């Protein structure tokens, strides 16, 4: 087995009795081999998730769904260049503070430091950088890069839905010189970020602050307008809109297909969390049972404990160590007195 840094093992012999050097397996280091196009890998995101030498892409960045320049912003943060670090993050992620609260940290799962002791706290650093800016007197507004000598574009673009996808689409369009309009049927923008994630996990003021930055780029958000009901695509075409992006999300709960799933008091987790997030009036009576072992199930259980003083029980198929929920979420649920029943 070769060490990627060319090191020898403790107690490994380097010479024989005659004093001659003993060769041992060594992995070629990137600095010792010529670099050229023959070393490139155009499919690095699919085939290169451990060793980053062939492409120069670290495992953390490869594992990140947003493909953020993680090594770069960590180095900039180390140097105290927080605004530069935020600018680098926002090249790929328009909502870094939100992500810092709800990200499942695939980057940290792939971090090779974790093979020694613990992974680098990548998500916490991103969260610190983003929240530091939101709490400042003057917030960082990304610089636009308009691919036209004439300035911004006049074409009107309509985006249907102000959830993460719609906000991201508007953000990147605005950075290239467009002034898109988002049509949102709910009273507030954010989609499942606002109506599906409990406030104890994601503060709504923080979400609103990051959306305000997107507005400052020239994005218009019209809430309380349901496309297809209050206005149609044809109506928007007549108003001069040339492009459309449907970001309506997937906000319907999934039922397990068992008897009693439509009984009174039975909710899908998505519907339940939306009602709680929208502060709609609904009553919980008696003990609460949550079926599932993922993070959404834990969200439903923990928000239930805040709605009613009763026994909250979770039932899931998986063993404790196989539960889809993160260990952090599980531990916090247990600390709040939620009963966990595995292997059902």
Give the label of every model feature segment.
Residues 1-153, 204, 244-262, 338:
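Ferredoxin-type iron-sulfur electron-transfer modules and their immediate structural context
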Residues 246, 268, 290:
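Redox-cofactor binding/interface segments in oxidoreductases and associated redox assembly factors
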Residues 258-272:
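A short, gly/pro- and small-residue-rich
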């Amino acid at each position: 087995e070769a060490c990627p840094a060319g090191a020898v093992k403790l107690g490994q012999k380097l010479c024989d009795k005659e004093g001659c050097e003993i060769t041992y397996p060594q992995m070629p280091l990137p600095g010792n081999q010529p670099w050229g196009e023959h070393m490139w890998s155009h499919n690095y995101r699919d085939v290169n998730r451990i060793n980053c030498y062939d492409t120069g892409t670290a495992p953390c960045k490869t594992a990140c769904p947003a493909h953020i320049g993680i090594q770069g912003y960590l180095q900039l943060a180390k140097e105290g260049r927080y605004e530069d670090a935020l600018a680098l993050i926002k090249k790929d992620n328009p909502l870094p503070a939100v992500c810092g609260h709800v990200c499942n940290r695939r980057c940290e799962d792939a971090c090779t430091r974790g093979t020694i002791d613990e992974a680098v706290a990548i998500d916490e650093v991103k969260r610190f950088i983003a929240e530091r800016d939101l709490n400042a007197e003057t917030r960082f507004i990304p610089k636009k890069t308009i691919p036209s000598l004439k300035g911004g574009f006049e074409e009107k673009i309509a985006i249907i839905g102000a959830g993460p996808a719609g906000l991201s689409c508007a953000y990147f369009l605005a950075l290239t010189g467009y002034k898109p309009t988002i049509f949102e049927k709910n009273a507030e923008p954010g989609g499942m970020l606002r109506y599906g994630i409990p406030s104890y996990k994601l503060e709504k003021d923080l979400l609103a602050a990051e959306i305000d930055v997107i507005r400052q780029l020239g994005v218009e958000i019209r809430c309380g307008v349901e496309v297809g009901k209050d206005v149609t695509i044809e109506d928007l075409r007549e108003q001069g809109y040339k492009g459309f992006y449907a970001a309506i999300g997937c906000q319907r709960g999934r039922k397990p297909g068992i008897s009693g799933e439509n009984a009174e008091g039975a909710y899908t987790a998505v519907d339940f969390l939306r009602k709680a997030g929208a502060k709609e009036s609904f009553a919980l009576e008696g003990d609460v049972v949550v079926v599932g072992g993922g993070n959404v199930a834990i969200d439903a259980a923990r928000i239930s404990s805040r709605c009613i003083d009763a026994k909250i029980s979770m039932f899931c198929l998986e063993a404790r160590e196989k539960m889809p929920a993160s260990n952090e979420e599980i531990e916090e649920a247990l600390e709040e007195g939620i009963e966990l029943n595995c292997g059902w």
